């Protein structure tokens, strides 16, 4: 299966630094049939990034609202996402959930806004350290995915990418063990298999949580890991490019 390497730039960057970052990422060599690459800049820089990156690198928004338009100051709509030329969308990132109170219902409503379009939805799920230590991992992930798996058709679900990000490993430098990553990805795939086994086999499930160049090979080589959602390491072209290179090697060996 093609690996998917994505960079979530979060609320970082300036026109100058993003120009330098795009220049660096543009220099990476990889087989685009084996590896897909996408980045999620801050929305104010999307047009700049689209203009500066090669066309084969996807560009997405980090969030949208589920409202169509109107008096919702500060929000971005699905129509705006299309209008600026984005082809990816992050939905339900743990920071959206924890800092802004985003719920599973909100995630589902946002997904519904773009599920029948050409935009690739990346739905983020993950547990807190308390949930994992309390033995609630499977319950939490099942709940986070239930609305999506129960209400979308197989054809719609086939467009969805799931990003597993243990909340306790995001931006902390703490990385889940290889066993934890594989077991959790395998569990997520088993949830999808209850809907359709072929869907589960082909659905991309990527890992996010302090993924960096030094651990990329081991994590991306796991049988149920189809790529990565990279945070801090994606802000350095050399490191992000090395992760892309590692994915490319895995897919071509």
Curated annotation (Swiss-Prot):
Note one Pfam family from the annotation.
Answer: TIM
User: In which pathway is this protein known to take part?
Assistant: Carbohydrate biosynthesis; gluconeogenesis; Carbohydrate degradation; glycolysis; D-glyceraldehyde 3-phosphate from glycerone phosphate: step 1/1
What keyword terms does UniProt attach to this protein?
Cytoplasm, Gluconeogenesis, Glycolysis, Isomerase
**What would be an example GO MF term here?**
triose-phosphate isomerase activity
* Gene3D superfamilies per UniProt: Aldolase class I
Provide the Gene Ontology terms for cellular component: cytosol
Recorded hits in CDD domains, A to Z, give:
TIM
Cellular location of this protein?
Cytoplasm
First-level EC class:
isomerase
Could you tell me the EC number(s) of this protein?
Answer: 5.3.1.1
Active site per UniProt? 93, 165
Q: Where does substrate bind?
A: 8-10, 171, 210, 231-232
InterPro entries assigned to the protein according to its UniProt record, in alphabetical order: Aldolase_TIM (IPR013785), TIM_sf (IPR035990), TrioseP_Isoase_bac/euk (IPR022896), Triosephosphate_isomerase (IPR000652), Triosephosphate_isomerase_AS (IPR020861)
Give the top-rank taxon of the lineage listed in the UniProt record for this protein.
Bacteria
Coiled-coil regions in this chain? none
GO aspect biological process, one term? glyceraldehyde-3-phosphate biosynthetic process
Q: According to its UniProt record, which reaction does this protein catalyse? A: D-glyceraldehyde 3-phosphate = dihydroxyacetone phosphate
Please state the protein's primary subcellular location.
cytoplasm
Q: Which family does it belong to?
A: Belongs to the triosephosphate isomerase family.
| Subunit structure, interactors included | Homodimer.
Protein task: Involved in the gluconeogenesis. Catalyzes stereospecifically the conversion of dihydroxyacetone phosphate (DHAP) to D-glyceraldehyde-3-phosphate (G3P).
Q: Which HAMAP family match?
A: TIM_B
Q: Identify this protein by name.
A: Triosephosphate isomerase
Organism listed in the record: Francisella philomiragia subsp. philomiragia (strain ATCC 25017 / CCUG 19701 / FSC 153 / O#319-036)
